[in-house]
Amino acid sequence: MPTFVQILDFIGTFAFAISGIRLASAKRFDWFGAYVVGLATAISGGTIRDVLLDVTPGWMTDPIYLICTGLALLWVICFGRWLIRLNNTFFIFDTIGLALFTVVGVGKSIALGYPFWVAIIMGSITGAAGGVIRDVFINEIPLIFRKEIYAMACVVGGIAYWICDLAGMESYACQLIGGSAVFLTRILAVKYHICLPILKGGEEPEE
């Protein structure tokens, strides 16, 4: 019987895989290429986190992550036209994956006994790194490097999780509140065009 954290991890994997496959389809990738992009989106953040925490990445011990990505590919193949008509499809699935993976990363780090600042960084890596790899694969400037609030939403959610944990709340409540903080921060930032200031260092050098 999967735990609550594992369920969040599986849902996050599916959501992030959908976001990667959806963008790959827009770039006219074939099915295999789309699967690779979806898989990279889904597992990259967790893999980097686990390597830093000296833990074996989950996809190396359990094929469910590969299966979730395969199901995401089938979902896009079967319902691709519906997904295209649905406004903000990519944004919705990407934000869901971002929120769920952030709390999984924070929770895993805290459970291993790391201090809160490490947990917040690991949560941010878990949530945002997959999107960076995805955008590199499809030759786009990663969202994390644009002026949109992206990784900062992970930081906000990580802090919310830590405060709840510090207050002695149950882990599922910490995950719910932390994930909601990530989700709402991202939604509100996009809705009200809240952005981080752009660093201005003069004109771009001539090539």
Task: Tell where the protein language model's regions lie, with residue ranges.
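Intrinsically disordered, low-complexity non-transmembrane regions of multi-pass membrane transporters
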Residues: 1, 194-207
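Helix-coil boundary and interhelical linker segments in multi-pass alpha-helical membrane proteins
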Residues: 1-4, 50-60, 104-118, 163-174
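N-terminal topogenic module of multi-pass integral membrane proteins
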Residues: 1-53, 58
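Structural signature of hydrophobic alpha-helical transmembrane segments
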Residues: 2-13, 57-71, 115-127
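C-terminal ends of transmembrane helices
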Residues: 17-27, 50, 74-87, 132-142, ...
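Cytoplasmic-side transmembrane-helix entry/capping segments in multi-pass membrane proteins
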Residues: 32-40, 62-67, 87-98, 122, ...
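Short, structured motif recognition centered on aromatic/hydrophobic residues
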Residues: 36-40, 47-53, 121, 125, ...
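Ordered, amphipathic secondary-structure segments that act as subunit-interaction surfaces
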Residues: 71-108
